[in-house]
Amino acid sequence: MAVYRAALGASLAAARLLPLGRCSPSPAPRSTLSGAAMEPAPRWLAGLRFDNRALRALPVEAPPPGPEGAPSAPRPVPGACFTRVQPTPLRQPRLVALSEPALALLGLGAPPAREAEAEAALFFSGNALLPGAEPAAHCYCGHQFGQFAGQLGDGAAMYLGEVCTATGERWELQLKGAGPTPFSRQADGRKVLRSSIREFLCSEAMFHLGVPTTRAGACVTSESTVVRDVFYDGNPKYEQCTVVLRVASTFIRFGSFEIFKSADEHTGRAGPSVGRNDIRVQLLDYVISSFYPEIQAAHASDSVQRNAAFFREVTRRTARMVAEWQCVGFCHGVLNTDNMSILGLTIDYGPFGFLDRYDPDHVCNASDNTGRYAYSKQPEVCRWNLRKLAEALQPELPLELGEAILAEEFDAEFQRHYLQKMRRKLGLVQVELEEDGALVSKLLETMHLTGADFTNTFYLLSSFPVELESPGLAEFLARLMEQCASLEELRLAFRPQMDPRQLSMMLMLAQSNPQLFALMGTRAGIARELERVEQQSRLEQLSAAELQSRNQGHWADWLQAYRARLDKDLEGAGDAAAWQAEHVRVMHANNPKYVLRNYIAQNAIEAAERGDFSEVRRVLKLLETPYHCEAGAATDAEATEADGADGRQRSYSSKPPLWAAELCVTUSS
């Protein structure tokens, strides 16, 4: 054991010699899948050079001896951060789409011919391995919906290795959906076409929106199938196995540090490496020296101060990330500690969603029955997850120090970044005023009261006529009213979800046996259902004309306050024309015209399930330029989808159609 640890220490010391983003790859033997005599030679991908530093710096479990398939058998993986695995081949892999901007990170140009698509399908499905790739699954734990779940790990993803580019950058490649690993538990390690298309498109959409995120380089489907019960309603169906190539500096997450956790007082579960403080030190050394080298350099002689500076920076990055989410209306859906990147990146796209009608209590994940991960709760949950990270870092970071850093940094950094971004979204370019926070809050309240579309309302505000007596004001108000929810949309949104008899029984139980009612954990759900019933009753008594008049009144009040604030901004500018140009430019650069709404993704998925990948590729191109551009007319003409049997066209920048309200995404999505 002493020799083993000494070897690991030497490996880590060698890894530290390579600063962040700098690579010095050495020739690697050709990787081969188990049972394969010789791997096909890549051509387009031949220039990729691997230098798998993580596997040298961190403990790796050697697969146990046994029959074929034993390395992927479900089991605890103690004393290791990775375990060796192999992808399971797919039948007839086919390329769905490539992201050229993501692959450019690896030094790859556009595929030269159709042959390159076949090559991408072969290597990015895991059916063949690139020279130097060393597949491994990462061990981590996590708090899921607030409860410690014990060992989780890469149950459907595999580390391929780290590609070093000619510019000295280093990128970790992952295959998501490449087959079972020891962390797959009772699952099959596969992902399906619908969930893979969603992750592929959203990873790239978020990058082009300017949100910190992991990337997706390719999506490959196949003729292999697995059974999935999408809505957990007893109606399973066969779906195509699909793999996404994911790209990031690292996929290490908060849960990576939870493998050392002792038995949880509530769940009784523990991490697989309890008591292995030596591995926690290794993991901290690796993460900080590799991805926070400036912190390593500044505190090389004081590990506690180094670890404190590291936690402070992770806290700030996480606060900025979730602030960006709130500003583009993004809901993650599964904010468990195992889905939180140690670099402050958005990671693991599952039942995510973008706000359509603004609702601060929107829950995008149908599996989230308590609304724990609602849109408005995301900052609070991220702070909670950081608290769990602080717990996981002790004793290397004393808990009281971690808690003090969290209290000092998170809320302040979130509010600062959020308000800074919101000022840009409102085109406030000249002066910052204390009252700006109240203006933003009132805007969101107005959007909520009128059911306004989040993305389109912000985008429309760039055309708000600043002049008091502008003839365009009436036209602007008319366009703004179009972005408010109609009576039909509101009645659909607030329709009761529970049988009235069941609701009545639950209310009777709450009265007669409050202790039992509390144990059932349905209080939040019942409260939401009562709100829906009350709202539905109010809507039944409201006419369309009354709704329109009410909405106009709400918006007139806020727009008056907004114009007054714009006047103050203009007062600080020397040149009114220059201010107006900058005001509009900043708004166009911060208010997207296109986001990946669920119905846009669903259209692409349904076409792909019929074998037509053109819609996935078209949506991908659309999402690469989400913000306003002068050449937008041609793009807009293409950004439409057939709406119904009559072939009417709906722009992808329009409010979603009514049928989109019926879409449901779960943890299976």
UniProtKB/Swiss-Prot annotation:
| Positions that bind Mg(2+) | N339, D348
Q: Where is this region: Disordered?
A: 634-654
Coiled-coil positions: none
Single GO MF annotation: AMPylase activity
Q: Catalytic residues? A: D338 (proton acceptor)
Q: Which residues carry this modification: Phosphoserine?
A: S653
Which residues constitute the organelle targeting sequence?
1-115
The record lists the effect of D348A as: Loss of catalytic activity. Loss of ATP binding
The protein's annotated catalytic reaction(s) are: L-tyrosyl-[protein] + ATP = O-(5'-adenylyl)-L-tyrosyl-[protein] + diphosphate; L-threonyl-[protein] + ATP = 3-O-(5'-adenylyl)-L-threonyl-[protein] + diphosphate; L-seryl-[protein] + ATP = 3-O-(5'-adenylyl)-L-seryl-[protein] + diphosphate
**Superkingdom, according to UniProt?**
Eukaryota
Function, as annotated, reads: Catalyzes the transfer of adenosine 5'-monophosphate (AMP) to Ser, Thr and Tyr residues of target proteins (AMPylation). May be a redox-active mitochondrial selenoprotein which interacts with a redox target protein.
Q: Can you tell me which family this protein belongs to?
A: Belongs to the SELO family.
Supply the PANTHER family for this chain. Answer: PROTEIN ADENYLYLTRANSFERASE SELO, MITOCHONDRIAL (PTHR12153:SF15), SELENOPROTEIN O (PTHR12153)
Q: Name it.
A: Protein adenylyltransferase SelO, mitochondrial
Q: Which organism's genome codes for this protein?
A: Homo sapiens
